[in-house]
Amino acid sequence: MEPTAPDLQLVPEVTKAVSVSAPDPGPCRTAVIAVVGISMAIVTLGVLSAFFSAQGAHVEHIAELHGIRFTSSLQQENSDFYRLLTHALQTLLHFLLRALQPLSLKQEADILQKGIQARLQEQGLSLAAYGTIVSVELTGRCEGPVTERDLKSGHCPGNVFSCQNGQCVSKENPECDDRVDCSDESDEAQCDCGWQPAWRSAGRIVGGVEAAPGEFPWQVSLRENHEHFCGATIIGARWLVSAAHCFNEFQDPAQWAAQAGSVHLSGSEASAVRTRVLRIAKHPAYDADTADFDVAVLELARPLPFGRYVQPACLPAATHVFPPGKKCLISGWGYLKEDFLVKPEVLQKATVELLDQSLCSSLYGHSLTDRMVCAGYLDGKVDSCQGDSGGPLVCEEPSGRFFLAGIVSWGIGCAEARRPGVYTRVTRLRDWILEVTSAADMPVVPTATPAPATPSTPWPTSPESWAPNTFAKPTAAPSPVPLHPSTTAKPQECGARPAMDKPTRIVGGISAVSGEVPWQASLKEGPRHFCGATVVGDRWLLSAAHCFNHTKVEQVQAHLGTVSLLGVGGSPVKLGLRRVALHPRYNPGILDFDVALLELAQPLVFNKYIQPVCLPLAIHKFPVGRKCMISGWGNMQEGNATKPDILQKASVGIIEQKMCGALYNFSLTDRMLCAGFLEGRVDSCQGDSGGPLACEETPGVFYLAGIVSWGIGCAQAKKPGVYARITRLKDWILKAMSSDPSSMARPHTSSTRLIPSEPPKTTAAGLIIPEATTSRLATPRATIRVTTRPLNTTLSARSTTTRGQTAAPSAPGTTIHSHLPDCGLAPPGALTRIVGGSAASLGEWPWQVSLWLRRREHRCGAVLVAERWLLSAAHCFDIYGDPMQWAAFLGTPFLSSTEGQLERVARIYRHPFYNIYTLDYDVALLELAGPVRRSRLVRPICLPGPARPPDGARCVITGWGSLREGGSMARQLQKAAVRVLSEQTCRRFYPVQISSRMLCAGFPQGGVDSCSGDAGGPLACREPSGQWVLTGVTSWGYGCGRPHFPGVYTRVAAVLGWIGQNIQE
């Protein structure tokens, strides 16, 4: 095995500032780095070469130079300095000194200085012109030649941030985080950019959702001969970045134009801007076979007019860290599915997760390089696709600014399982990008000779023409050398979203709009608002325990669905409280365990104005500096008892626990959390107590980090607000939700409760939330390749019809039979040996229907309930709502069979109360164009009576969905037996998401479940008479077959009235 050299630093004695560990003799020798030139270096190289040729040693390392003041001209990879220095270092890094005596520091410095000087003097270059080398260090062994790695220059090693004055800052991502880390304040000097937008929600590009105007102001559509061909990102008034492979075929800038400021490809908005592309610079090391260095810089013919809808994204520092697991955003006008059938007119957006590099590399046969980064999900479903190439992968940092982490590059298919998207890693190529944009007189790297004037093909005919060969061996090419930020790209303006409202303060703050904080509740005793509360379920609110020190519960009412204390606007709801549970360890003296769980007298109906916030996991981390939102109707300034009529909102930062304790001269407990600003100005105040501190963890999804508890004054300097920390209290919250009422009810009228020494507080905060906030665990069981998370989707033009506004079910005494007299009859023995799933036989489940999209592929299941009526899941039609796109295939368990009946769908009726976010009322009726031909293979199932099925009832689920989580779909109908779980058990597994229209079925240990592609299919239970009744419709679940996460089904008995009304009409 080849020995590895320890780290070595060569420092001249006169500037010795770093301790140097002397190398030990023996097998593990210190490697001496020297850059040797013509004169004195030739002798040194000769000696070393002769010695090492005999030893046969070989080692490769990353080298870092310290102390040279590199200018932009040195960053050109075709410059003499860069080329000679790189070659010289590479030459000597292949030697490992194993037998020589250690050199003195002066000898090491002399060899280094004279070697480089001689090498450069040969070419007429002077080292003195560029500074004095302070040190060179080996940062560890690496695979591949040094020219394929990062040869970094500057004062600071590794991923340490370098201030403009040379100070090194070891803090991760210090730039633009609203905290000064450099003594010259250079880390915060150009950061007036990228504030939090007023509205945003997550979705998908493949099967995705539309972006709002101004939501992605850095997004550009690149037009080749007037057709959208690729995406690009604005980084300066005259500069865009895109993918180099976009210009493999069309290389003449005259063929290209850029459209910005519009979410519509037609550019119909007044804000749309079009300009010509003046020149295209592809990275000189770009490899079309491996897609390595897949980046291009485009100069525009005229500068873009920055405004509300046109803004640049922030370029990250070379040391910027985007950790695996971070949620980021992709956007583009690429195809909505892999087979090129759908191209959106409106810009699509999606949330993806950054993946571990080693993991992603293993998925792609280890063909990834350091210039690539992966994002997506291992189970597929969300991805960029053809036409999105060159577009942005942007990540929001705690400061609220958006940084360009990647450029859409390549992938296998679109949204396929275990085939995430691959993006060009911007941090590795940032310095080359800035080199191009800052060198105004630098000749652009040729993209190729101009193409002849032949007719172009605007759209590729196959995915392969978009995806470079991903398995070719990458070629070695030197990485760019880091460069100090250039001002040409106007970083002070980057990342902004001025079309969106910006957050402000609660004390002296701004008003929220209807639906902006849909989880906010006002607790009133008579007409008086006294505390806030937060919706965490359809029957549950959270508030502060101290709110009930002197409060009579029976006199309290919760007001929701409106931002007005007077109940004006929105969808106001007023409900009494059934019971209140204070934490058993609540301490009114120090306000420890300051949390209360409130059960409403009746369940809420979620809509766009009333939504629950997500509860975080107990292990969830809300890092210091994270900007979160507070909201409430509390006092707008300290000492002023006047409360606002309109809900107030503000943004506050999470504060380090020990620092907060020091500010209060009080040891905060683990159940407390501080948020605000050390200089004050923004805070919650009296009347905000019990309200939410909500943090947006993924775009559009807010988690409850804290409950407004206490503080000294309101918005005073060095006295931030203190909140009850939800992660430390969640176990009790969940236990209280699922416990018996008698075990949690406590009297709250005792006069022995003490008022806190400092008045309780309330809050108001800013950062708009889209309406999709909860049900993050809910994975709708619909399509396998396109849309599988409709709870976060919206639809621009739906053709589905809503009928029957009567939601109350009828109350038949027994099973409701369909119009055909022999409903629910199946061959005997249908339940034998099916636990764990097995293939169904012909005629075994004659009511099972496969819904085909465009008569091309199975998308969802359905159930025959009458001669011309099917029942399915409403979320199956979130994206594709036009009944003309759907067909019903029934009468066979084989998807490839030619024997079944194929019927056209005439109309689709989704339940009028269907909630796209929570999947409540997730049911739809499909009317066929004509009645089905009844036979032993085609027969309707019976509808159930109003009663719930008995707990533990053994029922059957069927479908063609995935055979395992993330796997492929079945070609033959599958069946499995599951147990119906009690409502209490179901709520224990899903404490927030379960409504009275849902039921759970499965096994606590997992193993048997419905999965993607089964949505809309039946949960059928057999009655003693032998008839089968439709108990549930497959809706959603967390994963497939996971322990403690059973499948969730729409309870058919809860929507019988609506079904009967439509079928009768």
UniProtKB/Swiss-Prot annotation:
Gene Ontology annotations of biological process type: plasminogen activation; proteolysis
Transmembrane segments: 32-52
PROSITE patterns noted in UniProt: LDLRA_1, LDLRA_2, TRYPSIN_DOM, TRYPSIN_HIS, TRYPSIN_SER
Keyword annotations: Cell membrane, Disulfide bond, Glycoprotein, Hydrolase, Membrane, Protease, Repeat, Serine protease, Signal-anchor, Transmembrane, Transmembrane helix
Entry membrane topology: Single-pass type II membrane protein
Cellular localization per UniProt: Cell membrane
GO molecular function: serine-type endopeptidase activity; serine-type peptidase activity
Residue intervals on the Extracellular side: 53-1065
Main location (coarse class): membrane
InterPro entries: LDL_receptor-like_sf, LDrepeatLR_classA_rpt, Peptidase_S1_PA, Peptidase_S1_PA_chymotrypsin, Peptidase_S1A, Tmprss9, Trypsin_dom, TRYPSIN_HIS
Domain LDL-receptor class A intervals: 155-192
Post-translational modifications reported in the UniProt record: Proteolytically cleaved to generate 3 independent serine protease chains. The cleaved chains may remain attached to the membrane thanks to disulfide bonds. It is unclear whether cleavage always takes place.
SS bond list: 156-168, 163-182, 176-191, 230-246, 328-395, 360-374, 385-414, 531-547, 628-695, 660-674, 685-714, 860-876, 955-1021, 986-1000, 1011-1040
Activity regulation (record text): Inhibited by serine protease inhibitors PMSF and 4-(2-aminoethyl)benzenesulfonyl fluoride, but not by EDTA.
EC class of the enzyme, as a word: hydrolase
Ranges of compositional bias, category Pro residues: 452-461
Gene Ontology annotations for the cellular component aspect, listed alphabetically: plasma membrane
Residue positions the entry lists as glycosylated: 549, 640, 665, 792
Region called Disordered, residue ranges: 445-500, 740-762, 788-814
Domain comment (free text): The serine protease 1 and 2 domains are catalytically active, whereas the serine protease 3 domain lacks the essential Ser residue of the catalytic triad at position 1015 and is predicted to be inactive.
Family label: Belongs to the peptidase S1 family.
Function per UniProt: Serase-1 and serase-2 are serine proteases that hydrolyze the peptides N-t-Boc-Gln-Ala-Arg-AMC and N-t-Boc-Gln-Gly-Arg-AMC. In contrast, N-t-Boc-Ala-Phe-Lys-AMC and N-t-Boc-Ala-Pro-Ala-AMC are not significantly hydrolyzed.
Protein name: Transmembrane protease serine 9
